[in-house]
Design a protein with these regions (language model features):
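N-terminal "arm"/small-domain region of PLP-dependent enzymes with the aminotransferase-like
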Residues: 1-67
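Active-site PLP attachment segment
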Residues: 212-251, 258-269
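Conserved beta-loop-alpha segment that forms the PLP phosphate-binding cup at the N-terminus of a helix
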Residues: 84-107, 123
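Conserved N-terminal alpha-helix of the aminotransferase class I/II PLP-enzyme fold
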Residues: 49-91
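Conserved C-terminal alpha-helix-loop-beta "cap" of PLP-dependent enzymes
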Residues: 294-469
Length: 485
């Protein structure tokens, strides 16, 4: 890494030069530096709305960068150990979909874990690729799906030698990591590309004693959520490329769906955050890992909770663990994760990342403080004392392996009918059903509905999970394929 170059933030510096010129705007956006919308200026501040500007020669253009954005991309690539990098303003959803669209066309097969984010399956709807799912092992105690085992991936490769790519979560939402280096080696030996979904892995590029990053493992592409653990603004992300990819071809794919009016607030936040991580990331994430480990130890002293970590590593389905993730099993207190999630927010003014049926996740990152950790630990102890109940009759599984009957694209565009949820068993789903977060589909278009899946959906709904993907906001009806396939 070139530390001298990494001290620069070319987009931010260009914005500052532009701001000082006091240019009179006769272009968009129409709020004209906030003057046309005083309430917006009051909410965000005059400097913020003053930097919400349009693409122009001094500020470059994200769709075809030739100056400051191009330089910012080069600095990202240098900092992350990539050959090329793209700044993304459509979130990591856009980055994941661009990865898949760059390597898959209609009819191509892609090997991926079923516990992928909905953005990956949405990409299959867009391009018509065929998923070859690897159903990961499930930890029976925690009710969470683990990582893809090398043997599972190798079996899928052997059975589908015509597959063009393998997608790997690195890490999962819960912090679970697969043996990415070995998967890359075996995929490349078969001529397959490897895509790393690192929506929750920005820190892997800078922290010490953390799981291997996608680029370091030799993956061909990696989608990285800078806004999650890297400090940039929500919706800003990165797409990293290794030498095997044609960068300009990938840019063409990105430009199919990415906005032509990129936000300079998002772009400059990526620029500044990259500089911060390049110069101070190792120290910052060492502190993050220390806070997360301290929280784990304190929470496990309470009783009724299990804050898991490196103890899950088994060399196969849990090859490594991201110690910055504070994932906590809650059923020992007779409380679903979503119930603890709601209690923390409503009774203790603590907002955590998500709660599902069995677990909660508190996202620890560069903006956290030890006093905040202490407050979380205290609240969890209070909840254990005041709200603990019998866990009899509670579901304990987060993941049900579905049967794929039709491709996501085929099912998504097929003629459908709406049926009461209880009457859909044996039918083929025509839409997504998921708890969000984490956004991993319980059902995806083209998958068979089973009694177990219906019971899980209704249980999650009744426990208060935020359900998404369905046309029916009440989660009482499901769109299924009319007359089968």
């Amino acid at each position: 890494m070139d530390y001298e170059r990494q001290q620069h933030a070319p987009i931010y510096e260009a914005l500052e030069r532009f701001r000082k010129k006091r240019v009179v705007p006769f272009d968009v956006p129409g709020h004209k530096r906030g003057r046309g919308n005083p309430e917006l200026a009051q909410l965000l501040g005059e400097k913020c709305v003053g930097l919400d500007v349009n693409s122009m020669k001094p500020l470059d253009n994200l769709c075809h960068p030739v100056s400051v954005i191009r330089e910012a991309e080069e600095l990202v690539a240098d900092a992350f150990g990539a050959v090329h990098a793209f700044l993304m303003v459509g979130g990591t959803t856009s980055a994941v979909q661009s990865m898949i669209l760059s390597v898959c066309k209609a009819g191509d097969k892609i090997i991926l874990p079923r516990n992928v984010h909905k953005s990956a399956i949405n990409a299959l709807v867009l391009c018509g690729a065929i998923p070859v799912y690897v159903n990961p092992e499930v930890n029976a105690q925690l009710g969470i799906s683990l990582g893809m085992e090398v043997s599972q991936v190798e079996k899928a490769m052997d059975e589908n030698p015509d597959a063009v790519a393998v997608l790997v979560n690195n890490p999962t939402y819960y912090g679970i990591c697969s043996d990415l280096r070995t998967i890359v080696k075996k995929a490349h030996a078969r001529g397959m590309k490897v895509l790393a979904d690192e929506a929750h892995g920005t820190h892997l590029y800078f922290g010490r004693n953390l799981p291997v990053s996608g680029m370091a493992a030799g993956a061909d592409m990696a989608a990285v959520s800078m806004h999650k653990s890297g400090g940039s603004l929500t919706q800003s992300s990165l797409l990293l490329l290794n030498k095997s990819m044609n960068a300009e071809k990938v840019r063409q794919i990105i430009n199919l769906t990415q906005t032509t009016s990129a936000s300079y607030l998002l772009l400059s936040s990526l620029d500044i955050s990259r500089r911060n991580l390049a110069l101070r990331g190792e120290e910052s994430f060492e502190k993050v890992a220390g806070m997360a480990q301290y929280a784990r130890e304190e929470i496990n002293e309470i009783g009724g909770y299990y804050a898991y970590g490196m103890d899950l590593i088994n060399g196969t389905s849990v090859f490594d663990f991201d110690v910055t993730k504070l994932s906590i099993y809650t059923l020992g207190n007779g409380l679903a994760g979503i119930e603890v999630y709601d209690l923390l927010r409503d009774e203790y003014d603590i907002q955590i990342e998500f709660g599902d049926i069995c677990n909660i996740l508190a996202y620890i990152s560069i903006g956290d403080r030890l006093q905040d950790i202490e407050r979380l630990v205290g609240a969890l102890a209070d909840i254990e004392r005041l709200y603990k109940k019998d866990s009899t009759g509670m579901l304990s599984g987060e993941y049900i392996a579905p049967a794929v009957v039709a491709s996501p694209q085929q099912a998504f565009y097929a003629e459908k009918e709406s049926l009461p949820m209880e009457q859909t068993v044996g039918r083929i789903s025509g839409e997504f059903v998921m708890c969000y977060p984490p956004g991993i589909p319980i059902l995806a278009p083209g998958e068979m509905v089973t009694q177990e899946i219906v019971e899980y959906i209704l249980y999650a709904r009744d426990k208060g999970c935020s359900m998404q993907g369905m046309e029916d906001p009440k989660v009482e009806h499901l769109q299924v394929l009319k007359g089968g396939i």
